[in-house]
């Protein structure tokens, strides 16, 4: 019983530490992503739109063909 209790307490502490780290990392990524997105939109607006349109058209055509056949 002593061994079981020890392993149980160990796993609990590990789980708590992982949870806290994940939260802090997610918050940092969110802020950085928003800042980078705003900067990119101002500079490369035309190129982005053209690239996205072509990519979307190709994707949808492939999906429709698969469904019909």
From Swiss-Prot:
Family according to the record: Belongs to the protamine P1 family.
Gene, per the UniProt record: PRM1
NADP as UniProt keyword: no
Protein name: Sperm protamine P1
Species in which this protein is naturally found: Pseudochirops cupreus
Function: Protamines substitute for histones in the chromatin of sperm during the haploid phase of spermatogenesis. They compact sperm DNA into a highly condensed, stable and inactive complex.
Region Disordered: start-end pairs: 1-69
Biological processes, Gene Ontology terms: chromosome condensation; sperm DNA condensation
Cell compartments where the protein resides: Nucleus; Chromosome
GO molecular function annotation: DNA binding
InterPro entries, A to Z: Protamine_P1
Keyword DNA-binding: yes
Keywords: Chromosome, Developmental protein, Differentiation, DNA condensation, DNA-binding, Nucleosome core, Nucleus, Spermatogenesis
UniProt note on tissues of expression: Testis.
């Amino acid at each position: 019983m002593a061994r079981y209790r020890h392993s149980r307490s160990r796993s609990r502490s590990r789980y708590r530490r992982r949870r806290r780290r994940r939260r802090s990392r997610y918050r940092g990524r969110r802020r950085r992503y928003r800042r980078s997105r705003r900067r990119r939109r101002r500079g490369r607006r035309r190129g982005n739109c053209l690239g996205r349109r072509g990519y979307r058209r190709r994707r949808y055509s492939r999906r429709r063909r698969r469904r019909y056949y």
